[in-house]
A protein has these predicted regions:
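N-terminal, positively charged, Ser/Thr/Ala/Gly-biased leader segments
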Residues: 1-23
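C-terminal membrane-associated helical module and adjoining short loops/tails
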Residues: 2, 7, 152-322
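Intramembrane alpha-helical segments
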Residues: 2, 7-8, 76-158, 168, ...
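Alpha-helical transmembrane segments of integral membrane proteins
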Residues: 13-17, 21, 42-50, 88-92, ...
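Membrane-embedded alpha-helical segments that form the functional core of polytopic membrane enzymes
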Residues: 18-65, 97-105, 110-125, 176-193, ...
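Membrane-embedded alpha-helical segments in integral membrane proteins
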Residues: 20-32, 95-103, 148-150, 227-237, ...
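Acidic (Asp/Glu-rich) catalytic motifs at the cytosolic membrane interface
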Residues: 50-88, 193-210, 319-320
Length: 322
């Protein structure tokens, strides 16, 4: 069953990286709206599935636009190998995007607008900007917008009235949900920017081993600096500081472990090293999101979301994530 070409086309392991983005945004903006959160759980579920459908539509459309390149570099993929017809893939992409937009419309007009913006951004990336200078910037923007998408439920008519006094956006405790939302979005942006920058060399045979090794060292230093900045801001912004720190330290440890292993692989084959880093950084996005969720709702909530890495890792052994 895991060898089914449609599962490979949809890259099922990747699906588990999507819900945490939405949950982070949802919790960030709803911390000061505890009375409204219960009635908004349905919106959270709808936004999660909408985001998943948009993501799947993006993956399929990516393979449709890349079919000529994949015939040379990845001939075993479902489309270039002929296991799935191009027309079938096109229908799947249209269906996924349509479902994503329709579900968003059930939340509110802002959610629908963001879902439309996500779809347009995904298609522009796949068609025009995937191989250009703006590649990492656009992909990072799309994924960070997904976090904001999770917070879009707040514009529903039933909760907008709660914002009229402005007290919830900047509470007496000094906590600002909007600043936390911005921080979480920036964290996801940075992570995806690094990931996408690296993935550019994934199918390039002329990757220099020495250059890759230097890149790994630079990335590790950059990550360390970024985490220090994030930690400093998080201490001020999040309610559950210790819970956040626990998972951030886990994230830091896993990032260090990832690049240490990649450095050893570099001596064998640069291309395989890039694939290894890209795949695992995608999985580690779940842990990064889980840290913010722990800071927003406690360690238990963050730990539960972090468990999404398990099906991601297991399925990733049989189905390519890149």
């Amino acid at each position: 069953m895991l060898q089914n070409p449609y599962l490979k086309l949809l890259r099922i392991p990747n699906v588990f990286t999507v819900p945490p983005d939405i949950i982070v945004g949802f919790l960030a903006i709803s911390i000061d709206f505890s009375s409204s959160v219960g009635s908004s759980i349905s919106d959270l579920i709808i936004l999660i599935f909408s985001s998943i459908f948009l993501y799947l539509g993006g993956l399929v459309s990516n393979d449709l636009f890349d079919i000529k390149v994949d015939r040379l570099e990845r001939p075993s993929r479902p489309l270039p190998s002929g296991k799935i017809k191009k027309t079938n893939a096109l229908l799947i992409a249209v269906l996924m995007f349509s479902l994503g937009l329709i579900l968003a419309a059930f939340v509110n007009h802002v959610s629908f607008g963001i879902s439309l913006l996500l779809m347009v951004g995904i298609l522009l990336y796949n068609y025009k900007f995937k191989n250009g200078f703006f590649r990492p910037y656009l992909m990072a923007a799309i994924r960070s917008l997904n976090v904001i998408y999770g917070a879009s439920f707040i514009f529903d008519v039933s909760t907008t009235s709660a914002l009229e006094n402005g007290d919830h956006l900047f509470s007496n405790t000094g906590f600002s949900p909007l600043l936390l939302l911005a921080l979480a979005s920036c964290a996801v942006y940075f992570h995806i920017y690094i990931l996408t920058s690296l993935s550019k060399s994934e199918t390039t045979q002329a990757v220099s081993r020495i250059k890759n090794k230097l890149n790994i060292q630079k990335i590790q230093i950059t990550y360390l600096l970024f985490l220090l900045i994030s930690l400093s801001l998080a201490i001020i912004l999040i309610p559950f500081k210790l819970d956040f720190l626990i998972i951030v330290l886990l994230f830091l440890f896993l990032i260090k472990l990832l690049f240490n292993r990649a450095s050893k692989m570099d001596r064998i084959q640069g291309e395989e090293m890039i694939k290894f880093i890209v795949k695992n950084m995608l999985i580690l996005l779940i842990i990064l999101d889980s840290a913010f969720i722990a800071g927003e709702a406690g360690l238990l909530a963050g730990s539960i979301v972090a468990l999404l890495t398990i099906p991601c890792v297991i399925l990733g052994k049989w189905i390519s994530m890149t």
